[in-house]
């Protein structure tokens, strides 16, 4: 890596963040594209966010990636939000346009870009998402923005169930796309929705231990279903193994991780990240 007086910086900001794979991905991308940049990981306290944002301008940085717990808090420092970031209510990428800071959310678009190798396009398709956390909302919002026909969200009944239902109703009203919430434990209803589904996504952390399972194993998957697990630290979760045994195409979360990074990289540099080469390196790293 060449570092000189012309080198520009980007960084990921979160707490904690020292475990992040983002520096590996982006610094490799800078090298492979001959872009004179460097990417760092900054673990900062909330009270330092304002100073960090100002340094993006002062140091003419490309921008920032934002991870937990600051994806919502960073919004107040933005000059403008992309449609996806505004709809999701979270920013994971800050882009510096000559001192004007624009907040984007690349999680959803990165996810769907990672499915292009399956010739999958979300337009006019039905999607079933397991979970209602931040990752799920990003996928749901992007699916709606990209013209999905119907989105079904399955979550367990808990204190967050009714607030999630309200949030999904607002997303539906803003996008005009039908978005329904159903109980994850309701096997009959899930089977009915699965029969009409083109894409099934596990957006929960269930399965990260390599043993737990997010839904009823008695459910039957329709033909030609694409099944994705957002988890990438376990190469094939029990969920993906179950889907593969039923003949489904399967994809783990590594594509989503690299996909959102590729979208950020493009917004900063105008260059396409060499995703295939980086995926090969990441498969050795993870």
Swiss-Prot record:
Taxonomic superkingdom: Bacteria
Catalytic residues (positions): 71
Disulfide bond annotation, renumbered to this chain: none
Enzyme Commission identifier(s): 1.1.1.25
Residues the record lists as binding NADP(+): 131-135, 230, 253
Name of a matching Pfam family: SDH_C
Binding positions (shikimate): 20-22, 67, 92, 107, 232
Sorted UniProt keywords: Amino-acid biosynthesis, Aromatic amino acid biosynthesis, NADP, Oxidoreductase
Similarity-based family: Belongs to the shikimate dehydrogenase family.
Protein name: Shikimate dehydrogenase (NADP(+))
């Amino acid at each position: 890596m060449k570092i000189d007086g012309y080198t520009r910086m980007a960084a990921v900001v979160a707490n904690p963040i020292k475990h992040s794979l983002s520096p590996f991905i982006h610094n490799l991308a800078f090298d492979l594209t001959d872009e004179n940049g460097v990417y760092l990981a900054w673990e900062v306290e909330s009270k330092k966010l304002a100073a960090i944002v100002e340094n993006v301008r002062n140091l003419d940085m490309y921008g920032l990636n934002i991870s937990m717990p600051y994806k919502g808090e960073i919004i107040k420092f933005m000059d403008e939000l992309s449609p996806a970031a505004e709809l999701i209510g979270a920013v994971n990428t800050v882009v510096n346009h000559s001192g004007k800071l624009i907040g984007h959310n690349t999680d959803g678009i990165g996810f769907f870009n990672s499915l292009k190798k399956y010739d999958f396009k979300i337009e006019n398709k039905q999607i079933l998402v397991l979970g209602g956390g931040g990752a799920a909302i990003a996928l749901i919002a992007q699916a709606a923005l990209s013209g999905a026909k119907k989105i079904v969200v399955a979550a367990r009944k808990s204190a967050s169930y009714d607030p999630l239902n309200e949030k999904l109703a607002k997303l539906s009203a803003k996008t005009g796309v039908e978005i329904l919430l159903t109980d994850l434990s309701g096997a009959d209803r899930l089977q009915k929705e699965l029969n009409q589904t083109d894409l099934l996504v596990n957006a929960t952390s269930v399965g990260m231990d390599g043993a737990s399972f997010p839904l009823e194993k008695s459910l039957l998957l329709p033909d030609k279903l694409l099944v994705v697990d957002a988890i990438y630290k376990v190469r094939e979760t029990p969920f993906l193994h179950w889907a593969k045994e039923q003949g489904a195409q399967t994809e783990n979360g590594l594509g989503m991780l690299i996909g959102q990074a590729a979208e950020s990289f493009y917004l900063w540099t105008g260059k396409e990240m060499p995703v295939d080469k980086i995926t090969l390196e990441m498969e050795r790293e993870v």
